[in-house]
Design a protein with these regions (language model features):
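Conserved beta-strand in the GNAT
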Residues: 58, 65-74, 95
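Conserved acetyl-CoA-binding loop of GNAT-fold acetyltransferases
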Residues: 5, 122, 141-150
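Conserved acetyl-CoA binding element of GNAT-fold acetyltransferases
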Residues: 84-98, 153
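A short beta-loop-alpha structural element at the N-terminal edge
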Residues: 2-17
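Conserved GNAT-fold acetyl-CoA-binding loop/helix
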Residues: 23-45
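Conserved beta-strand-loop-alpha-helix junction that forms the acyl-donor binding cleft
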Residues: 126-136, 153-156
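A short helix-loop-beta-strand connector motif used in the catalytic cores of GNAT acetyltransferases and
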Residues: 43-58
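Conserved glycine-rich acetyl-CoA-binding loop
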Residues: 65, 93, 97-111, 118-120, ...
Length: 156
């Protein structure tokens, strides 16, 4: 298995992975997530893949077929009256194909993202995770992430 930057040829598989992510959330919260859907279409992915501020990494099998992806976004807080000036690498989306789970692909992807973030000199890695996605929460905790803030809701 190899981790590399995603390329245009990976878009069909990335779209499939995005549907898998959506369905995890839809199955847990059908009141919020439509399912089956993707957060980006192929044209949007082409733009994202070309942008150095939004690197996407894939972990591929021996045939260069993506088994998982990690969408990242470089963020920087500057000139804020309350917050310090820091650079953050935000993980917008991370997924391992249903058929490839249990093979440590998620760990390999996360460790690659972590090494990339260090090489870019960012202060931290951040992400959001839905509380209904307990598997993801456990994975992120195992990777060393700690809660930074909590979003809450009251359904009326």
């Amino acid at each position: 298995m190899t981790v590399r930057r995603a390329e245009e040829k990976d878009i069909p598989k990335i779209l499939d992975l995005l549907v898998q992510v959506d369905m995890v959330h839809h199955n847990a919260r059908p009141d919020i997530f439509k399912g089956p859907a993707t957060k980006y279409n192929a044209d949007e992915l082409r733009v994202i893949l070309k942008n150095e501020e939004t690197p996407v990494f894939v972990c591929t099998d021996d045939n260069s077929i993506p088994l998982g992806h990690a969408f990242c976004i470089h963020k920087q807080i500057t000139y804020n009256s309350v917050l310090t000036d820091i650079r953050t690498l935000y993980i917008d989306d991370i997924c391992v194909d249903d058929s490839a789970r249990g093979k440590h692909i998620g760990k390999k992807l996360f460790n690659y993202v972590k090494a990339y973030a260090k090489s870019m000199g960012v202060y931290n890695i951040t992400l959001n995770v839905w509380s209904c996605n307990e598997t993801a929460m456990k994975f992120y905790e195992a990777m060393g992430l700690l809660p930074q803030k909590t979003g809450m809701e009251l359904i009326l």
